[in-house]
Amino acid sequence: MVFRLSPGDVAGFKFLFSLAIMYAIMSALVYSIVHMKFIKPLAIDAPLDRFSEARAVEHVRVLVQDGRQEGRPGLREAAKYIKAQLELIEDRAGSNIRIEIEESVVNGSFNMVFLGHSISLGYRNHTNIIMRMSSKDSKDADSSVLINGHFDSPLGSPGAGDCGTCVASMLELARLIVDSGWIPPRPIIFLFNGAEELFMLGAHGFMKTYKWRDSIGASINVEASGTGGLDLVCQSGPGAWPSLIYAQAAIYPMAHSAAQDVFPVIPGDTDYRMFSQDYGSIPSLDIIFLLGGYYYHTSYDTLDKLLPGSMQARGDNLLSILKAFTNSSKLRTAQEREALRASSDDYRDEQAVFFDYLSWFMIFYSRRVAVVLHSIPIAIFLLMPFLLHFLELGLRSWFAMFCDFVKGLLLHAAGIILAIVFPVIFSIMRLFFSSCAMNWFAHPYLAFMMFIPCSLVGLLIPRTVWSCFPLSQDVSVLKKSKEVLSDEAWFWGAFGFYACLTLAYLVAGLGGGFLTFSVSAFMLLAWISFNAYIKSYHHQSLWSTVIYVVPLIPCILYSVYFGGFLVQFLIEKMGMMGAAPPPYGFYIADGVVAAIIGVVTGWCVGPLIPICGRWLARSSIIQFLLHISVLALALSSQFFPYSNTAPKRVVFQHTVVTTDANRILDSSYDFSIVDSNSLLFVFKYAPEVAKDLHVGTDFSFKTANMSHRETWMALFPVSHLFSRSLKFPASSDDIIKEYRYFPHLSNYKPHTISSKGSRKVYLELSLG
């Protein structure tokens, strides 16, 4: 049997392949931008008045030589190295600049909510290194700018990215300020804090004890959730001023107000919280490396994993932003901010709307402007039926046209929903025939191959089913053809869908409304171009569709940029987002990634569907896309989920339960995982581990010893991300030989009960 294509099918496939080429070119451009391919790092012999990534990398090289975890000698050595480098910078400074260096040991206690759990923390003897740089004429009370980075590293990690890059960038920046001869008009405080990984203790100690903390008028927190890539402003505030300064000053702007809508969902936090939210209300920026998350908090976070160009972009940006902050008339001390808040009715903590375009330039507008701008699309959608029929036929059939527009809106919404649902269904179906989840984890392109084609199928189904739009208007009365009226209904329905989403963002007070607003704005331009072509040539053709697509290219390119980065970031983070209990936990990671790719596909392709759907919504194309989806699903099952550059995270703990000062009750190895592939997967593909733990081929969770959540109290509340942790017996002989006495708690005084019924217990901790 010969499979024949009609001329319309041939034209549709030509158009589909043309779109595929367009999106491929856009994806290649976006990949280059996100991975800093267009930024040339300066060499170690670069001019001294320029920030040099190579010089900064040399600092990272020293910092990663030994572990910088709290309690290890490497942390103390890192503090000595940082202080020595700052003293060298002080020696090079001219007579017109004042540099003060201080090593501070902080103690304190506080309560915080982390991952939805309230925890209380007490700490002592944590080290902060502080340098205050100011002009000779400055006063102690002058408002200043704080830039913060932490030099401790997480357990088991060299910490090249997190946060050796932060410390190195700050050291090179401090050197640059001195060697360039720039005298800051306001003081700049460099804080190298030594305890961020332990619930931000160093930043808390600084905010509670530093003598000039009330003089700080703005802060910049530099962080790393990976080894480079986009250095994104993930949080800013309170107020719009910090993001405005960034928009005006950044050389390579990388910021989206939408990030503040997403950041609270991520299981983590930064020192930004201490400065701008919990203990300071300081106008702040939280700037974070986001790519390379595979290595985040692992032993793979090494010097060779750093993405070239990332620190160069960060350094150039930071210098420009520091200059803008120190020159701003809005840089105020804590007392001045409080006085302004009390006396001015115009003082607002409203968040602005801002976004960068491919890190080339940045668009910023206030919340008040957003209220007006983001209301325009819905106003156009509601008024357009009345305006069109008032100009053409009076008031007689405007309601029928509005009904058609609403039908178009509902059908477009159905397409977007199906574009999300279909990939989720396909991801679940694949797992029915596979023994492992997350095959895309080490190979992100597999996720796009698997889920984009089936998402397109969902997007096209409404247009395929309703190839003839169910018009409410009477074609016999109107001077327009049914084809033209259908195109109007499809277009204005889709436009109305994005207008409604824009309004929903606005009402909810979220910062991501610019995403759908830009789609609405460019769709209008495309519609005007399309109609101008039709009026000139009096017929629709493939060229008229191309005329519709061309004005949308800037919008589509941004959608690919934002959406592609979002998917890449999410895929990297799925390896540490936690393990849900079976049976549903096995499907969650694949379902989430499939749903996000469906959303991104709907966002990137959805604006094209009203006009391009005429060529794409054909049964032959639907079948072709389904075949690609099935083939990609089958192909992906042949790939192993992990690799040396995308390792699986396994949490291992040697647990020793003691009583009194010298007796061991129990000794065990506790294992857990933080993604969808269980420990059975680990034992299957890491036979050495199974052998050491005496795990046989007949092992099952039903007969295994489960590790109780209380066992992981040292990692609370991160331990709530674990599921089905296992416990294996361990010998205690080596421990008894090594230690004569163990840490233990004892009462050193009888407990007391207050008049209100609360009990006070007096405990003494002996370290053994």
What is the meaning of each model-derived region?
Residues M1-D9:
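N-terminal Lys/Arg-rich, disordered targeting/topogenic segments
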Residues F3, A20-L29, P377-S725, D733, ...:
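Alpha-helical transmembrane segments of integral membrane proteins
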Residues F15-A24, A28-D45, I82:
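Hydrophobic alpha-helical membrane-insertion signals
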Residues V34-V57, P641-N662:
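Alpha-helical transmembrane signal-anchor/signal-peptide segments
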Residues P41-Y365, G768:
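Soluble extramembrane regions of membrane proteins in the secretory/endomembrane system
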Residues K80-R132, I245-Q248, T658-G768:
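Extracytosolic and intramembrane catalytic regions of membrane-associated proteins
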Residues Y210, D214-V233, A370-R396:
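C-terminal domain-closing interface element
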Residues D346-F381, S397-F405:
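Cytosolic-side membrane-insertion boundary helix
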